[in-house]
Curated annotation (Swiss-Prot):
GO terms for molecular function: ATP binding; identical protein binding; protein tyrosine kinase activity. It is found in: Cell inner membrane. GO terms for cellular component: membrane; plasma membrane. It holds the Pfam family Wzz. This is Tyrosine-protein kinase etk. Its EC number is 2.7.10.-. The keyword Transmembrane helix applies. The gene is etk. It is an enzyme of class 2 (transferase).
């Protein structure tokens, strides 16, 4: 036994160190479990990496240049700063249904043709074995919905170009190159490259479903900020198909950009063609008015000052007219809060102020000069506008016929030769880490949740004396265990029939050696007791009380003492199976008055002691144990035997042990390593003491040699046997 100094304050540093060592020991104790789980997860990751379908990535590069506008906007560069190309709207345009819809129509992406493989692993296995996949070329396919749902058809390849098409409500045979129609389904197969018996699953999705599926694998990003370089990427399991899709998207985007530019030029050209006749008519009218006025005034000419003012006014009017045309174009592209539009409005305001200033100078001139100046201004301004519009018309005609847009394809689509998924090395590493994390976490969680007693100190902290620690007998455990332990349970079930008797069949076992040490401790503990009767009980079922009491009876009998073993567990006692003796006449028959002592006492020859088995299970075991015949039996046995060992039921299950314990001199409580908690043992001892039972202490049974226990408490139980040599 060990003692504990209650006045010593706990050292938190030492306790933390012990807890850490205990956790390390737990990991070492369960190293096989950790290795197995980690290996399992690693193998799963390897299998996933090998069997999963490789995903490839294709990319193309498109440049969006700064919008130059049409000829009407060609003069804006002098009043607004250069701006970077706006990539965000172009990215949205590339991902729009307008662009993707054209690609889906061009490549027939609504049609889905998939070869049928064994579920989950079939495709990966075919790829690993380098089995060439089948190919099915479809010229035309139409699959209507059935009951509002998309339907799938199964095509089975036959011999010599024949095939069988199966739907939910039909089965029909077809031939390559011939149109097949059945229940609204129309199909024309152009070519089949597959072995007979190969199956394909055919389905057809809506255009919107195809667009949504394409958007999930298609991404657009700007390579660097405000660079105008757009990188288009697409992922998929068919390298050739994703290359064709990307090229189609890029070309469709380019064509719509050119068409849009041409449409803008065409719209501007139409605007100019409407304006030219009106401007020409206004010019003719202005010239006629000027000529008429001069004839009336005898060819009045302008002085130098008036000519200078006229030139300035005409210049301002020309600029204002040019801004009018520019605004007509800009209003189609930008809102008024756009920097380009704001710059135009500011320029117009400046010119308007300049024109007002010039008009004030004109108003100070003689009336004749004012009128001539006004008419001349109208003629010069009209002539400038007309010539400008003619030039613009020619420029727009050329621009419309040679429109190239502001987009160009820099790099055509290319698929990278190596798949981007799965990342095999990363998957294996993650599988290893995940398996290690889960296994270690499970072991540590189990260690933190486990509350069973694993060392005598845990009982002694509650004031309970520990008379012996009996190690687990691996020899006996292998022969009697009914089920294997699991990680989160210490409870083990053992056979109660056809079991060996350890003290006789393997007397050199370490558990038997521990019981011999218990025999020595009991010799001194029972010297001052009122009788030589020893009761052994347990806290809960499966604590091992019968094993301890029967083995103790055998080792004491081996020291030439006369021993009587009484099985007082009238409910579940199984000593008759352990000793291979009859159970027809036992303790229950004696207590009920059916048999006398000479009929219920049997001699167990192999063990060298006498036995009273439990007998037949009575309906009232507690009441039988409370009868005087039980007390009389114990008194008689005390007089005729050197030691009487009474095996009683678990204390927390029934009260039988408290009934029997009042008549015995010494009592011991068996606690199972890892199964019983210190609270259960303490509560059992308390109930026995309240019943007036002289309880000496406890026995820690089934101790397993663990690294965690050794690190925490420094125990190394009974490693010596007769076969060991020094």
């Amino acid at each position: 036994m060990t003692t504990k100094n209650m006045n010593t304050p706990p050292g938190s540093t030492q306790e933390n160190e012990i807890d850490l060592l205990r956790l390390v020991g737990e990991l070492w104790d369960h190293r096989k479990f950790i290795i197995s789980v980690t290996a399992l997860f690693t193998l799963i990751a390897v299998a996933y990496s090998l069997l999963s379908t490789p995903i490839y990535q294709a990319d193309t590069l498109v440049q969006v240049e700064q919008k130059q506008g049409n000829a009407i906007l060609s003069g804006l560069s002098d009043m607004i700063p250069n701006s970077s190309p706006e990539s965000a709207p172009e990215i949205q345009l590339l991902q729009s249904r307008m662009i993707l819809g054209k690609t889906i129509a061009e490549l027939n992406l609504r049609d889905i043709v998939e070869q049928k493989y064994f579920p989950i692993v079939g495709r990966g296995w075919a790829r690993l074995t380098k089995e060439k996949p089948g190919e099915l070329a479809i010229s035309w396919m139409h699959i209507p919905q059935l009951n509002g749902q998309d339907q799938q058809l199964t095509l089975t390849v036959g011999e010599n170009g024949h095939y069988t098409l199966e739907g939910e409500e039909f089965t029909v045979n077809g031939m390559v190159g011939q149109r097949l129609e059945k229940d609204g389904v129309a199909l024309t197969i152009a070519d089949i490259k597959a072995k007979p018996g190969t199956q394909f699953v055919l389905s057809q999705r809506t255009e919107l479903e195809a667009i949504n599926a394409l958007q999930e694998t298609f991404t657009v990003s700007e390579r660097s900020k405000e660079s105008g370089m757009l990188e288009l990427t697409m992922t998929g399991d068919d390298p050739q198909l994703i290359t064709r899709i990307l090229n189609s998207i890029a070309n469709n985007y380019l064509q719509q950009n050119i068409a849009r530019q041409a449409a803008q030029d065409s719209q501007s050209l139409e605007f100019l063609q409407r304006q030219l006749p009106e401007v020409r008519s206004e010019l003719d009218q202005a010239e006629e008015k000027l000529n008429v006025y001069r004839q009336q005034r005898d060819s009045v000419d302008l002085n130098l000052e008036a000519k200078a003012v006229l030139e300035q006014i005409v210049n301002v009017d020309n600029q204002l007219n040019e801004l009018t045309f520019r605004e007509a174009e800009i209003s189609q592209l930008y809102k008024k809060d756009h920097p380009t539009y704001r710059a135009l409005l500011e320029k117009r305001q400046t010119l308007e102020q300049e024109r007002k200033r010039l008009n004030k100078r004109v108003s100070a001139m003689p009336s004749t000069q004012q009128e001539v100046l006004r008419l001349s201004r109208d003629v010069e301004a009209g002539r400038a506008v007309y010539l400008q519009l003619l030039n613009r018309q020619q420029e727009l005609s050329i621009s419309k016929s040679s429109a190239i847009g502001n987009v160009r394809i820099i790099d055509p689509a290319v698929t990278q030769p190596q798949p981007v998924k799965p990342k095999k090395a990363l998957n294996v590493v993650l599988g290893f880490i995940l398996g290690l994390f889960i296994s270690v976490g499970a072991v540590l969680a189990r260690a933190m949740l486990r509350r069973g007693v694993e060392a005598p100190e845990q009982l002694e902290e509650h004031g309970i004396s520990v008379y012996a620690t009996i190690p687990m007998s691996e020899w006996l455990d292998k022969r009697t265990r009914l089920r294997k332990k699991n990680l989160f349970s210490n409870q083990q079930r053992h056979r109660t029939k056809n079991i060996p008797f350890l003290a006789v069949d393997n007397p050199a076992d370490s558990a038997v050696e521990a019981v011999r040490a218990l025999r020595t401790s009991l010799h001194f503990a029972m010297m001052e007791t009122e009788n030589n009767i020893l009761m052994i009980t347990g806290a809960t079922p499966d604590s091992g009380k019968t094993f301890v009491s029967s083995t103790l009876a055998a080792v004491i009998a081996q020291s030439d003492q006369k021993v009587l073993f009484i099985d007082a567990d009238l409910r579940r006692g199984y000593s008759h199976n352990l000793f291979t003796v009859s159970n027809e006449h036992g303790l229950s028959e004696y207590l009920a008055g059916k048999d006398e002592l000479n009929k219920v006492i049997q001699h167990f020859g192999k063990g060298g002691f006498d036995v009273i088995t439990r007998g037949q299970v009575p309906p009232n075991p507690s009441e039988l144990l409370m009868r005087d015949r039980m007390r009389q039996l114990l008194e008689w046995a005390n007089d005729h035997y050197d030691l009487v060992i009474v095996d009683t039921p678990p204390m927390l299950a029934v009260s039988d042990a408290a009934v029997v314990g009042r008549s015995v001199g010494t009592s011991l409580l068996v606690a199972r390593f890892g199964l019983n908690t210190a609270k259960e043992v303490s509560l059992s001892m308390q109930r026995l003491e309240q019943a007036g039972v002289n309880i000496k202490g406890a026995i820690l049974n089934g101790v397993i040699k663990r690294a965690s226990t050794a690190y925490s408490y420094g125990y190394n139980y009974y490693g010596y046997s007769y076969s060991e040599k020094e």
